[in-house]
A protein has these predicted regions:
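Internal alpha/beta core interface subdomains
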Residues: 96-119, 123-138, 307-308
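Dinucleotide-binding Rossmann-like beta1-alpha1 core, especially the glycine-rich loop
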Residues: 64-117
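Residues forming the flavin
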Residues: 1-83, 124-325
Length: 325
């Protein structure tokens, strides 16, 4: 099988690669290889059974079109000050322009036009004063809440757009290896579950996300591809009654707080706050289960949950921080 561009993984990075190519008028043949299902076919049995049934071969929440994002809290943080290391790679101004552009794409596919955390400046000042007294920094960050259920509708619209614009997507197909010739990637090896075949391509984009991080690390090691361990966030998810977080929920929707507590003074931050949300379970390889938070636009709980995370960059005494976490 041959194509012009093969993209491994139909998470946000893979999706937006194909989307941007089509929006810019590219007529190159694009193939996305995704081991999970189409977004409309992803259904977590726990919603019916009340318990995790350990779906095989993959968890429906973590794999499939749009990745874990289809079942997350569905929030867009609209400030370059929040998130990964993009500002250090391309600069703060370009990072903010990219965020704004990405936000406009979500809006074009039906995202809610409401932005949280930009009004009621006096109430924000009071929350900031309380944070300072507690030794914390409150980061200003506008939030667009898509909603867990609405995010799935938006990603379905994006999926249909790609299919209508001649992007081929192989669902239920796993990339098992890269095809390298004289140090150049010329394609990928794909397993359909019944057969294995090669896909030759002029360009290969590997966008496997967290779900494929271990696989990608092993591929890099096998082929001698230089790579560097990324940041690991280790922490807990906390759930409290809505009344405890009422002011923050109503004024900001999500608070972005940063602290450097004793004794180690490592950076600790709040993340993924879900007013009226639900704590969820996600399963990965080797029977690893972690928790996430969902926040629906319509269905609400009496609780608020959020993560408290400590970020680490390290490679001594080991160089597999994700496995350690």
């Amino acid at each position: 099988m041959e194509t012009d561009v093969v993209i491994v993984g139909a998470g946000p990075a893979g999706i937006f690669t194909a989307l941007e190519m089509r929006k810019r008028g590219s007529r190159q043949r694009i193939l996305i290889v995704e081991k999970g299902l189409a977004v409309e076919d992803r259904r977590c049995p726990k919603n019916i059974t009340g318990r995790c049934v350990n779906c095989k071969p993959y968890c429906y929440i973590t794999t499939g079109f749009s990745g874990a994002g289809a079942f997350s809290d569905g929030k867009l943080s609209l400030s370059y000050e929040v998130g990964g290391d993009l500002p250090s790679l391309i600069g703060e101004r370009k990072a903010q322009e990219t965020i704004d552009y990405t936000d406009s794409i979500y809006l074009s596919f039906g995202a809610d036009g409401t932005v949280e955390g930009i009004n009621n400046s006096e109430a924000v000042k009071e929350i900031r004063r309380r944070a300072i007294r507690a030794g914390l920094k409150l980061v200003d960050c506008p939030i667009r809440h898509l909603g867990t259920e609405k995010a799935q509708d938006i990603y379905y619209a994006i999926e249909q757009y790609l299919l209508e614009h001649d992007v081929e997507i192989l669902f239920g197909h796993a990339c098992t290896n890269l095809i390298l010739e004289n140090g150049v990637c010329r394609g990928v090896i794909v397993d359909s579950g019944k057969t294995t075949f090669d896909v030759k391509a002029k360009h290969v984009v590997v966008a496997t996300g967290r779900r494929g991080a271990d696989w990608l690390e092993s591929i890099c090691a096998e082929h001698g591809i230089a790579h560097q361990p990324g940041t690991v966030d280790i922490g807990v998810r906390v759930e409290v009654r809505n009344e405890v977080m009422e002011t923050v929920n109503e004024v900001l929707y999500e608070s972005k707080l940063i602290g450097y507590p004793q004794p180690f003074r490592n950076k600790v931050r709040t993340f993924c706050q879900n007013p009226g949300g639900f704590v969820s379970q996600e399963n990965y390889d080797n029977d690893l289960a972690v928790v996430n938070g969902h926040a629906y636009k319509e269905k609400k709980s009496p609780n608020t949950n959020l993560a408290i995370l400590c970020s680490h960059n390290f490679n001594v005494p080991f160089d597999q921080p994700i496995a350690y976490a």
